[in-house]
């Protein structure tokens, strides 16, 4: 039996020499080295706080990631490396299953190595393997759905739609973005002979499984006025950068890596031109649909990334057919590795920060865009937002302790965004600070927490605006961090006294969903 036929016929069996096993272990090892460097990212702090306020949903995400983040933080004793173990494991599994998926669709060892290496070294996945975020499980679950569709096509076992439903339900509990993939995938399936399977009862049983899993979150969103839809409108109408179709496509070469994107394009070609499996065509069409959706709706460039592991697999299989000579295959693998290693420090925190800045300048590297309208400093946003939070909390604590005892009893920190508020809630506990308040995203729902607004500590903002809203104010300190985002550094710390409108009644005015 050939390697190709073996890949189509067999299931998973463990073999230490398999590319999937080796690449998965290398991925995990690299992230165990890197993930403890720098510090907690803005969103990670926020997810921990959200998870400590357990609920069936949140303004800006489903419940599972905050729950896992808070659990990881507690079990790891607040250690950064322990906290980021789950992202590392999820990414290692994604890389391993990308290589294994190649085997399942009939690819040989070269194709397995090529697809796995491209996934391992894709900039977008390297950083997602670091940060605990709503994207942590996206590539893994989207690949899981593609895997199920392939096995459905190969075996005809319609009970696999139940597995499809389980994966979908899990993914929806981590991020709603898979809904776009499901729509795009349905359009892709309708364009293939597989459309007949969409009428089978097992499809609807699988959908029922997913619906039951996500129902509590849907009910929570309904009870709170569908805040996630309001958040989505804010992203479309201003938060996210507007990219032309050409610029959005060009960004994909930074997300997947230049050579990785070439393999993805080969996967699209393989799906459109005489595909061996109709799932490949459905995925190619799904990519086109997703591209149109995200360009027109101002989606961030990395929103397309979760579909890439499956396309890498189909692309690598097609390249394997084209490159018959060992020399050509070896050159392809070496090229992917060399270029990937050169780009890795741009998205993997393996260098001391000053060394990273010099390295970035030396190679002229452009980190992948986060897709937001933000002024960037010396570091890309995903690194910059790991710095300055502890120092900020310490400065706020100094201001808080300098207040007279009577004022301290009434004082509260108001965060202009959830990053500031979460940093106070996480780092301020040990410094004697009370829980923070904010109007940003889920902090708005937690309200003023019993504070009347008579003494508020706040960072930055418009002093003239404060003069209108409060009886008096003063500058009590300053925050400064060389590496933080520009709008989070070199800012005054104000103490505001005597709010003119009661905080409880004016709270709706601070609502800020973004």
Where are these regions (language model features)?
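Transmembrane-helix signature of polytopic, membrane-embedded enzymes
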Residues: 3-4, 8-21, 98-121, 140
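Membrane-interface transmembrane helices that cradle and orient dolichyl/undecaprenyl
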Residues: 13, 103-106, 145-161, 267-275
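Short helix- or helix-capping micro-motifs
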Residues: 24, 115-123, 168, 172, ...
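Transmembrane-helix motifs of polytopic, lipid-linked glycan transferases
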Residues: 85-106, 144, 148
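Short acidic/glycine- and proline-prone juxtamembrane loop motifs at membrane-interface regions
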Residues: 124, 130-138
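Short hydrophobic alpha-helices at membrane interfaces in multi-pass membrane enzymes
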Residues: 148-169, 200, 204, 208, ...
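Transmembrane-lumen/periplasm boundary regions of multi-pass, lipid-linked membrane glycan transferases
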Residues: 170, 181-280, 294, 344-355, ...
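Signature aromatic-anchored transmembrane alpha helix within multi-pass, membrane-resident enzymes
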Residues: 321-360
């Amino acid at each position: 039996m050939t390697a190709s036929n073996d890949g189509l016929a067999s299931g998973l069996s463990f073999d230490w020499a398999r590319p999937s096993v080796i690449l998965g272990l290398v991925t995990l090892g690299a992230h165990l080295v890197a993930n403890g460097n720098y510090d907690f990212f803005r969103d990670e702090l926020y997810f921990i706080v959200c998870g400590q306020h357990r609920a069936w949903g949140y303004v800006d995400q489903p419940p599972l990631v905050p729950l896992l983040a808070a659990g990881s933080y507690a079990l790891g004793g607040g250690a950064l490396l322990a906290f980021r173990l789950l992202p590392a494991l999820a990414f290692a599994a994604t890389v391993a299953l990308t290589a294994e998926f190649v085997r399942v669709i009939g690819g040989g060892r070269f194709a397995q190595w090529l697809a796995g290496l491209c996934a391992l070294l894709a900039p977008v996945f390297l950083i997602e393997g670091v940060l605990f975020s709503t994207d942590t499980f996206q590539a893994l679950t989207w690949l899981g759905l593609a895997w199920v569709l392939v096995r459905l096509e190969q075996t005809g076992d319609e009970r696999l739609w139940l597995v499809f439903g389980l994966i979908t339900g899990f993914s929806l509990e981590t991020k709603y973005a898979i809904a776009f993939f499901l729509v795009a995938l349905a359009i892709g399936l309708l364009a293939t002979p597989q459309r007949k399977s969409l009428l089978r009862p097992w499809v609807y049983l699988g959908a029922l499984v997913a619906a039951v899993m996500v129902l509590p979150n849907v009910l929570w969103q309904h009870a709170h006025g569908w805040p996630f839809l309001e958040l989505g409108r804010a992203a479309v109408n201003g938060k996210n950068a507007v990219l032309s179709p050409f610029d959005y496509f060009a960004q994909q070469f930074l997300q997947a890596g230049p050579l990785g994107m070439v393999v993805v394009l080969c996967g699209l070609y393989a799906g459109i031109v005489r595909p061996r499996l109709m799932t490949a065509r459905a995925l190619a069409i799904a990519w086109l649909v997703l591209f149109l959706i995200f360009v027109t709706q101002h989606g961030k460039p990395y929103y397309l990334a979760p579909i890439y592991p499956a396309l890498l697999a189909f692309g690598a299989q097609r390249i394997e057919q084209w490159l018959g000579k060992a020399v050509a295959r070896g050159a392809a693998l070496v090229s992917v590795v060399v270029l990937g290693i050169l780009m890795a420090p741009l998205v993997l925190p393996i260098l001391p920060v000053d060394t990273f800045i010099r390295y970035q300048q030396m190679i002229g590297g452009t980190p992948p865009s986060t897709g937001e309208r933000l002024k960037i400093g010396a570091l890309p946003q995903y690194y910059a937002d790991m710095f300055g939070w502890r120092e900020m909390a310490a400065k706020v604590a100094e201001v808080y302790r300098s207040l007279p005892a009577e004022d301290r009893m009434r004082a509260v920190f108001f965060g202009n965004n959830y990053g500031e508020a979460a940093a106070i809630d996480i780092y301020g506990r040990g410094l004697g600070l009370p829980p923070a308040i904010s109007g940003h995203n889920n902090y708005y729902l937690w309200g003023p927490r019993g504070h009347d607004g008579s003494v508020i500590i706040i960072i930055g903002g418009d002093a003239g605006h404060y003069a209108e809203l409060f009886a008096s104010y003063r500058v009590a300190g300053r925050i400064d961090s060389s590496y933080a985002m520009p709008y989070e550094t070199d800012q005054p710390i104000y103490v505001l006294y005597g709010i003119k409108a009661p905080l409880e009644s004016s709270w709706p005015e601070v609502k800020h969903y973004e």
